């Protein structure tokens, strides 16, 4: 597969992951699937917008760049056939690095949130009863949270989704960094029609 075609495939995969990451983060603002009575009852890590910012907004830019690489004009620099495509592939490395940073941000926040556990009402006060991640292996501890209903599985499911999706996004952006390097050094496997040639660009 050409480097431009590979980038387009990666970009097409990043878009739905970015949308899902954003939706997962939005759902976390509704603990247990219900509207929170007080914003202070929402887990702190939700307010850092890992899914909306890191896995969403910062991932849309690389995805759009990757999608446009295959259609980039290969005669972009003073009629030089190779310059346009190679520069576009080089710029994709920079956008891929932005994507890796966004995915890493979401990944770290999700891991911290999973280890810390949800903020819930223990009957006495709103607190974090699972500070050391022990609730992940011991479901009996979930009963420490009296409300909101089903807050532990809600928290666990959504942050796990964010963790997995951001990991995949980081991997895809890492692949594009390597792909972009090959495209910069070796060119794409074919020239677009404006150059009137079939050779490498």
Per-range role (PLM):
Residues 143-167:
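Individual transmembrane alpha-helix segments
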Residues 114-149:
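Extracellular/lumenal N-termini and interhelical loops of multi-pass eukaryotic membrane proteins
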Residues 127-130, 152-155, 201:
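Extracellular/mature segments of secreted proteins
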Residues 1-2, 44, 84-85, 131, ...:
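Intrinsically disordered, low-complexity segments enriched in polar/charged residues with Gly/Pro
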Residues 192-201:
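Non-transmembrane, juxtamembrane loop and terminal tail segments
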Residues 2-122, 162-185, 190:
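Signature of small four-pass
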């Amino acid at each position: 597969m050409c480097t431009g075609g590979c980038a387009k495939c990666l970009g097409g995969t990043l878009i739905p992951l970015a949308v899902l990451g954003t939706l997962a983060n939005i759902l976390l603002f509704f603990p247990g699937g219900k509207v929170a009575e007080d914003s202070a009852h929402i887990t702190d890590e939700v307010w850092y917008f890992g899914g909306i910012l890191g896995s969403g907004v910062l991932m849309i830019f690389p995805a759009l760049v990757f999608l446009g690489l295959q259609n980039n004009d290969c005669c972009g620099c003073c009629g030089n056939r190779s310059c346009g495509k190679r520069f576009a592939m080089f710029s994709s490395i920079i956008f891929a690095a932005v994507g890796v940073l966004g995915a890493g941000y979401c990944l770290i926040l999700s891991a911290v949130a999973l280890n810390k556990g949800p903020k819930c009402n223990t009957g006495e006060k709103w607190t974090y009863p699972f500070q050391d991640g022990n609730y992940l292996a011991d479901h009996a501890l979930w009963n420490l949270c009296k409300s909101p209903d089903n807050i532990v599985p809600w928290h666990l499911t959504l942050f796990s989704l964010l963790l997995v999706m951001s990991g995949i996004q980081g991997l895809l952006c890492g692949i594009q960094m390597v792909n972009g390097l090959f495209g910069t050094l070796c060119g794409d496997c074919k020239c677009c029609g404006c150059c009137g040639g079939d050779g490498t660009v």
